[in-house]
């Protein structure tokens, strides 16, 4: 009888030690208060962004800013490709606000739209989608998110002019990503059709940046995904007329 009791106690102790070990491991891997608290701001399925300190920092800053006194801003909305550019300097327009966040997705943009539309901006230029594909989302899912983004803007800020910029190509030879040229071109086709249906301005940047193999031209990038200075100058030349109008 004592032997059975001893075995039972031993097994229970081992079980508790295993559970404790797993909890310690989880805490070391980032299961902390910041991650839990962030769920009130960011959709939990944003795997790339929830664990990204840069994302959390920029997101919290945007939510902390008071409404600027200057109305009718021009907003650039997107991921790191948008964030990396000093748009107000590039386009010589101090009325431009950069709301790009590294690692963001179309779902992430949907979650933070309230922080955008409350500004009642004059124009919004949107580009996103590459990070969605990295999360395994389909072209259909990304298109659907775009549609919801545009309709949300129109519902909450009806005077805002929306500009959808085509998704730029990437260069798999440099970045080794699994995203294919076909995913990008299929998304761009969907966005162009949607823009025509909804009366949204569609800016087709893709042909200017793509090479003969369907990849981002090497002269416009260092890592195969993000643009360098020459790339942003080319982008500027394609959109500056929409800024002036």
Named regions from a protein language model:
Residues 41-148, 176, 182:
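Conserved SGNH/GDSL esterase-like catalytic core that processes O-acyl groups on lipids
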Residues 105, 132-134, 168-171, 209:
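Feature marks short, surface-exposed loop/turn motifs that line or immediately flank catalytic pockets
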Residues 97, 163, 201-203:
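General small-molecule cofactor/ligand-binding pocket signal
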Residues 127, 165-166:
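Alpha/beta-hydrolase-fold catalytic nucleophile elbow
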Residues 157-161:
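A short helix->loop->beta-strand "cap" motif at the edges of active sites that frequently abuts
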Residues 27, 169-245:
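Catalytic His-Asp segment of secreted/periplasmic serine-dependent ester chemistry enzymes
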Residues 149-153:
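Hydrophobic positions in alpha-helices of CheY-like receiver
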Residues 1-73, 87, 244:
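N-terminal secretory targeting modules
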């Amino acid at each position: 009888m004592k032997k059975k009791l001893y075995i039972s106690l031993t097994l229970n102790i081992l079980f508790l030690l295993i559970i404790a070990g797993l909890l310690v491991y989880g805490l070391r891997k980032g299961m902390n208060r910041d991650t839990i608290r962030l769920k009130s701001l960011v959709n939990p399925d944003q795997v790339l962004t929830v664990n990204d300190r840069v994302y959390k920092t920029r997101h919290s800053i945007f939510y902390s800013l008071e409404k600027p006194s200057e109305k009718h801003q021009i907003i650039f909305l997107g991921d790191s490709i948008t964030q990396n550019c000093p748009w107000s300097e590039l386009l010589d327009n101090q009325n431009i606000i950069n709301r790009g966040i590294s690692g963001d997705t179309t779902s992430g943009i949907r979650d933070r739209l309230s922080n955008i539309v409350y500004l009642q901006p004059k124009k919004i230029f949107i580009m996103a989608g590459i990070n969605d594909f990295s999360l395994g989302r389909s072209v259909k899912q990304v298109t659907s998110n775009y549609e919801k983004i545009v309709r949300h803007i129109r519902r909450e800020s009806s005077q805002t002019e929306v500009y959808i910029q085509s998704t730029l190509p990437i260069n798999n030879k440099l970045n080794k990503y699994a995203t294919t040229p076909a995913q990008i071109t299929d998304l761009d086709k969907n966005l162009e059709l949607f823009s025509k249906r909804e009366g949204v301005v569609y800016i087709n940047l893709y042909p200017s940046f793509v090479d003969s193999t369907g990849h981002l031209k090497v002269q416009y990038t260092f890592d195969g995904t993000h643009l360098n200075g020459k790339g942003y100058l080319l982008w500027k030349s394609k959109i500056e007329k929409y800024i002036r109008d």
